[in-house]
Each structure stands twice: as structure tokens, then as C-alpha cells.
Amino acid sequence: MNAKLKMHNTYDDTLIERDIVLSDASTGAVIAAIENAFDSADCTDETVFEIEREDGIIFYCDQWSDYTTAWSLYRHCNGSIQEWVANFKM
């Protein structure tokens, strides 16, 4: 399944979008793809992050917790990186 990753910094209205393939990907592969997509992004505590699957389902997080990696984003949003990835891969 394909998905679009979106990162919107509401402070300066910067929007970054990346495409990602979710089907048949391990949890680690999905995490790595997300980290790579936003690695150079200027994330702040006013950043909105979401993944929109091709079937229209959106998974949303309203804050990037320490501005550096997707790992901290997952912990901030759901407490469990495995659960978060499993949810949007379904």
C-alpha cells in the first residue's frame, strides 16, 4: 500500500511531503523510510505530522517531541512504536 507522509511546520507554514510504500514492509523499514523522509526537515514543537494511506485513512500526530527522529515522534504519539506502525500498515 502506498502512503503520503506530510510534515507541516505551522510556525513558518512549511509543508514537506514524501511518498512511501507500506505494503510488505517490516516495522523497521517503515520507521527508516519515515526518518529518511524528514531527516533534513526543520521540525519544531509546532510541527504537524501525518501519514495518509492510499485508501484515505489518515494517522495524525500534532507534535514532534524532540525535533530529531521518528522514534521520538512515535513515543510521543502512542507510547509504542510497534503499535503505531502496525496501525497504519493495516
Where are these predicted regions, by residue range?
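Short intrinsically disordered terminal tails
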Residues: 1-2, 87-90
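Acidic, low-complexity, intrinsically disordered interaction modules
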Residues: 25-85
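Short amphipathic alpha-helical "recognition" segments used for binding
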Residues: 8-10, 21, 54-56
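A short, exposed loop/beta-hairpin motif centered on an aromatic-Gly-Thr core
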Residues: 14-25
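Short aromatic-glycine-(Arg/Gly/Cys) micro-motifs in beta-strand/loop hairpins
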Residues: 1-14
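Intrinsic-disorder/low-complexity peptide segments enriched for small residues
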Residues: 3-5, 20, 71
